[in-house]
Amino acid sequence: MIRLGAFEHLLLLALVRLGDDTYGVPIRDELEARTGRLVSPGAIYTALDRLEQRGLVRSQLGEPTPARGGKRKRCYRLTAKGSAALRDAHGAIAHMTQGIKPKLQTP
């Protein structure tokens, strides 16, 4: 089983939601919108680099565009290994949270 940190888990979930070949800004926007937390670009790119080194995501440079001043953007997608890690993490969380809802109720 591949272990994921909480932020890595959220980042992989954002990649699934956004689909293939997404890049940093939409990933940050998705994370901020769904978690209500501010996320720095540095945190995103550091985590994406780490996930790529582990084979959980793959990146490639897109085509340069006039809107980006001729710069290319790095696009990311989940790998099969990343999907498996996400399924494992989701299963572990589902198993751990099973039956605790009544215990979370305020008296």
Q: Where on the chain are the PLM-derived regions?
A:
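Alpha-helical residues within the helix-turn-helix
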Residues: 29, 52-53
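Short, well-ordered turn and helix-capping elements at secondary-structure junctions
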Residues: 31, 35, 61-63, 80
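Exposed loop/turn and edge beta-strand positions of beta-sandwich/beta-sheet ligand-binding modules
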Residues: 72
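Amphipathic alpha-helical dimerization/coiled-coil segments
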Residues: 81-107
